[in-house]
Design a protein with these regions (language model features):
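Intrinsically disordered, charged and Pro/Gly-enriched terminal/linker segments
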Residues: 63-67, 92, 99-172
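Phosphate/oxyanion-binding loops and surfaces in catalytic or ligand/nucleic-acid-binding neighborhoods
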Residues: 44-47, 61, 82-86, 132, ...
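Short boundary/linker motifs that mark transitions into or out of structured domains
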Residues: 1-37, 97-106, 113, 152
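Short regulatory "switch" loops immediately downstream of catalytic or recognition motifs
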Residues: 18-21, 80-91, 99, 124
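DNA-recognition element of transcription regulators
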Residues: 30-39, 65-89
């Protein structure tokens, strides 16, 4: 079983995931689909995503994909390999299986692993800042912290997909 050291995920600006002294960062276009999958799973944390839904989100109409189900399995395998870099020295983890789970035809991000995502923290701070029942100093501090977390638009290097545009609009 994996230890419970928290993951820190940055999705505003450069996409990266850090855990302890280990970090994986999206670089270049070669691994774009892998990061796209990870982004979908993290953004929908707590939800089971059917294979069909993931295929629909990952391969747009016109994208050439002969065997989407097999392509998805391969992509999940590659994502798990990438995430293995976050496993700490003293942990036993079977090929990233702890990060991405699969059951009954659906994939999901493992909710048992503590995870802090910049966009979620920023949203929470902005909400606290807008709470008129709080002291003005507290509200200003919350807004200041929220602004500090904004490092750029949501997943800027992952393309032009509709779900990404919808999220970007929330944070602008």
């Amino acid at each position: 079983m994996m230890a419970t050291e928290k993951l820190y995920v940055q999705m505003l600006g450069d996409f990266s995931i850090r855990r302890g002294d280990r970090e994986v960062v999206k670089k270049g276009n070669r691994s774009k689909k892998i990061w796209h999958l990870i982004g979908i799973l993290l953004t929908n944390r707590g939800q089971r995503l059917a294979q069909e839904k993931l295929i629909q989100l990952l391969w747009r109409e016109g994208d050439e994909c002969i065997d989407p189900a097999n392509s998805l399995k391969n992509l999940v395998y590659r994502a798990r390999m990438l995430l293995d870099d976050l496993v700490l020295e003293d942990e036993v983890c079977e090929e990233g299986m702890e990060f991405i789970r699969f059951s009954e035809g659906a994939y999901m991000w493992n909710e048992d692993i503590p995870c802090e995502i910049d966009m979620e923290v920023m949203t929470l701070l902005a909400k606290r800042g807008s709470d008129e029942d709080q002291a003005i100093e507290s509200r200003i501090a919350c807004y200041s912290q929220a602004v500090e977390l904004y490092n750029g638009e949501f997943l800027p290097n992952l393309g032009e997909d509709e779900w990404i545009f919808a999220k970007r609009a929330q944070y602008e």
